[in-house]
């Protein structure tokens, strides 16, 4: 066990706590957090590297799409801290959806008519259990901000979004889960006319790595990329 993790286990109470996020883009949002694995959410360092781009890309967005909501901090951000007219959220994990629902209630957003949530997987085909981002093409206005965090299915999501990605003024924030997928996503978006940028991990990640799951698992490859096309935002 790393020294910081050991100290944390000695001083932090076990279990789920209702918390208000202290700093960063999500500051002020309320979430149910397990400090055994989610202390970084609380202090505001979770995925800190993309906070700047999240704020920049969503500042004038009309629509936000959160693919892989998990417990919903990005969807909560779009609802509570931006003027987007519609938020589409996708999360197939029932436990994560349950946490998201509780987090909506904590933030008094459970009755928002701006939010549409689906439990379907997002990939390249429409079926009973899955859908594509292209299925939204006729329902949305631009500018559009899309966040994708799907634990290895990044290219499946992008291949099912070719029509959507052809719309002007689309901005993307994508977490990649292997060096090979990072390159594949960059090439796909570049070929689709997007300017892209890899967001390097902060220097302090060697001390505070991103963690995931009940087993407090260190993410072996955890980097983000951003992309935009015809939106007047320099990357």
Listing of model-derived features with the role each one plays in the protein:
Residues 1-90, 98-103, 136-139, 199-235:
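S-adenosyl-L-methionine
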Residues 42-65, 111-168, 178-184, 188-191:
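Short internal loop-to-helix segment that lines adenine-nucleotide cofactor pockets
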Residues 93:
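Conserved SAM/SAH-binding beta-strand->alpha-helix loop
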Residues 100-115:
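Short, conserved SAM-binding/catalytic segment
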Residues 118, 194-203:
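Conserved S-adenosyl-L-methionine
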Residues 171-175, 197-198:
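Conserved active-site loop/cleft motifs that coordinate metal ions or position small ligands
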């Amino acid at each position: 066990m790393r020294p910081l993790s050991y100290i944390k286990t000695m001083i932090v109470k076990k279990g789920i706590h209702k918390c208000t996020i202290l700093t960063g883009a999500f500051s002020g949002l309320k979430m149910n957090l397990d400090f055994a694995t989610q202390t970084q959410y609380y202090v505001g360092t979770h995925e800190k590297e993309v906070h700047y781009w999240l704020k920049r890309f969503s500042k004038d967005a009309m629509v936000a799409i959160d693919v892989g909501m998990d417990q919903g901090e990005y969807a909560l951000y779009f609802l509570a801290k931006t003027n987007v007219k519609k938020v589409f959220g996708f999360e197939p994990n029932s436990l994560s959806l349950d946490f998201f629902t509780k987090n909506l209630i904590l933030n008094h957003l459970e009755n928002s008519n701006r939010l549409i949530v689906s439990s379907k997987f997002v990939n390249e085909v429409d079926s009973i259990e899955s859908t594509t981002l292209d299925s939204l093409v006729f329902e949305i206005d631009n500018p559009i901000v899309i966040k994708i965090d799907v634990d290895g299915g990044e290219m499946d999501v992008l291949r099912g979004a070719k029509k959507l990605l052809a719309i002007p003024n689309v901005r993307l924030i994508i977490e990649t889960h292997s060096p090979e997928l990072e390159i594949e996503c960059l090439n796909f978006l570049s070929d689709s006319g997007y300017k892209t940028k890899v967001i390097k991990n902060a220097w302090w990640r060697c001390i505070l790595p991103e963690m995931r799951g009940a087993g407090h698992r260190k993410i072996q490859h955890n980097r983000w990329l951003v992309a935009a096309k015809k939106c007047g935002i320099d990357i």
